Amino acid sequence: MFGLKQFYQSEVRTKLAQELDIKNPMLLPKLEKIVISVGAGAHAKDMKIMQNIAQTISLIAGQKAVITKAKKSVAGFKIREGMAVGAKVTLRNKRMYNFLEKLIVISLPRVKDFRGISRNGFDGCGNYTFGINEQLIFPEVVYDDIMVSHGMNITMVTSTDNDKEAFKLLELLGLPFAKVR
């Protein structure tokens, strides 16, 4: 397999340097980490479902998930401090590139009626976040093992603080953005 990291180092960096007119190669934007997170919502009280959500994310990411806990009690949401409210995984280096390649090549094309991911997920600091409605698009997830169907948020953190540069980086890496109408 050619590998997305090798593709980034051999082709994407040179295209970025030309298009963004950056002379110093150390200033070129790069992908630093990918965070996959799931909020349990109404299922936060059931620890078996929380364990199942964490296990599903671990299968998808290839790395153990961490169960996130509430920092404060919120009476309106019936949440107590320290209560499990979701799960997350932070991917870096080799696992990050493997996950991104699997997402682009295998998982996103399996989304029903897929026309590209939104361009509106940039936060103004060069990071991009988008949501997936269902975890079944990933080949590692077996339908019979799922207790609750849930979506997830995927955040891509880049080294740049500019949305334009981050968009160019992700576009050259092969992320299928929706066409502008």
Curated annotation (Swiss-Prot):
Recorded GO molecular functions are: RNA binding; rRNA binding; structural constituent of ribosome; tRNA binding
The terms describing its cellular component in GO are:
cytosolic large ribosomal subunit
Tell me if RNA-binding is a UniProt keyword of this record.
Answer: yes
Q: Could you tell me the keywords of this UniProt record? A: Ribonucleoprotein, Ribosomal protein, RNA-binding, rRNA-binding, tRNA-binding
Task: List the Pfam families hit by this protein, alphabetically.
Answer: Ribosomal_L5 (PF00281), Ribosomal_L5_C (PF00673)
**Domain of life assignment:** Bacteria
* PROSITE patterns listed in its UniProt record: RIBOSOMAL_L5 (PS00358)
Query: What GO terms describe the biological role, i.e. biological process, of this protein?
Result: translation
How is the subunit organization of this protein annotated in UniProt? Part of the 50S ribosomal subunit; part of the 5S rRNA/L5/L18/L25 subcomplex. Contacts the 5S rRNA and the P site tRNA. Forms a bridge to the 30S subunit in the 70S ribosome.
Return the HAMAP family for the record: Ribosomal_uL5_B (MF_01333_B)
UniProt-listed PANTHER family = 60S RIBOSOMAL PROTEIN L11-RELATED
The family classification in the record reads: Belongs to the universal ribosomal protein uL5 family.
Q: What is this protein called?
A: Large ribosomal subunit protein uL5
Gene name tied to this protein = rplE
